[in-house]
From Swiss-Prot:
Putative heterocyst to vegetative cell connection. A zinc finger (DZANK-type) spans 4-49. The gene is fraH. This is Protein FraH. A zinc finger (unnamed) spans 18-48. PROSITE patterns: FHA_DOMAIN (PS50006). InterPro entries: DZR, FHA_dom, SMAD_FHA_dom_sf. It comes from Nostoc sp. (strain PCC 7120 / SAG 25.82 / UTEX 2576). Keywords: Heterocyst, Metal-binding, Zinc, Zinc-finger. The keyword Phosphoprotein does not apply. Residues 204-260 form the FHA domain. One of its GO terms (biological process) is heterocyst development. CDD domains: FHA (cd00060).
Length: 289
């Protein structure tokens, strides 16, 4: 395994660059002692602790020394054989030349690196230094170990009381269907005309057309409607109950011939008589159907 020097990512043996950051990885070699894979610039083997520098110097010497190989230079031009025969010493008959032949050129010395074991090692013997003077050290008083502290007894956890199961009673479907079918109506006593209250509204405004609050129940078409204010009364739907309140009319609102003061409200029941204004001239009966 080769560890990247840039990001410390472990790479497989033989990898050239890091798989994570693509940084070139250092070259590796084998430990001469145990054969483990080590980096070429490592000082010690990570497996057996062998000193790799002890064998790195001879190996470098063998690698750098190379024998000098003579280079033969071919002649620039081939001599003419006829001219060689005309020379006086062409046949080599010169006695002086035969008596003193030219010495052959010496071969370059071949450098042979000596094996590591054959290299003599000169060990310098140095005299042992004198033993150091004994230093008197005062004996320190041993500190008594702390007394063991008994761990506190675990307090048994109090199991919480099981919460009572909440049973949510589903509302009966027939009652829901009955509420959906019940609608509130106002029956005009003077004309016997029925007005259905909008079931989608939680507040039904009763009055006549105006610029402030448009009425949901417009009484301007009934007789004697001049005694009804433009913003006269409201009927509120809260759950399954209907409430009526006077919102500041000029001639007042009466429930069952009793005045309904502004700010108060009355829960309507089937058959209640609602009079808008004095004199019982614009009257409605509350009905549920």
């Amino acid at each position: 395994m080769i560890v990247c020097p840039n990001c410390n990512h472990p790479n497989p043996d033989g990898a050239v660059q890091c798989e994570a950051c693509y940084t070139p990885l250092p070259a590796t070699s084998n430990c001469p002692n145990c054969g483990a894979t080590v980096q070429s610039d490592a000082a010690f083997c990570g497996q057996c602790g062998f000193n790799l520098h002890s064998v790195a110097a001879p190996a470098a010497t063998v690698a750098t020394i190379a024998p000098d190989v003579p280079v033969e230079v071919p002649p620039l031009a081939n001599p003419d054989p006829l001219l060689e025969l005309l020379q006086p010493n062409a046949l080599g008959l010169d006695p002086v030349a035969n008596e003193n032949p030219p010495a052959p050129a010496p071969l370059p010395p071949t450098a042979v690196a000596a094996p590591p074991d054959a290299t003599p090692v000169v060990v310098e013997v140095t005299p042992a230094p004198p033993p150091p003077e004994p230093v008197v050290v005062e004996a320190s008083i041993p500190t008594p170990p702390p007394e063991p502290v008994a761990p506190p007894e675990p307090v048994p956890a109090v199991e919480p009381a099981p919460a009572p199961e909440t049973v949510v009673a589903a509302p009966p479907s027939p009652a829901r269907t009955q509420l959906q079918q019940i609608t509130a109506r106002l029956v005009h006593v003077q004309s016997d005309q029925e007005i259905e209250l909008p079931p989608s509204l939680s507040v039904v405004h009763i009055g006549k057309p105006n610029d402030r609050i448009p009425p949901d129940v417009d009484v301007s078409g009934f007789a004697n409607s001049e005694i009804v204010s433009r913003v006269h009364a409201d009927i509120r739907l809260e759950g399954d109950a209907h409430y009526i309140e006077d919102v500041g009319s000029s001639n007042g609102t009466y429930i069952n011939n009793l005045p309904l003061l502004p700010g108060n409200r009355h829960r309507l029941r089937p058959g209640d008589r609602i009079s808008l204004g004095k004199g019982d001239l614009v009257t409605f009966l509350f009905k549920l159907a």
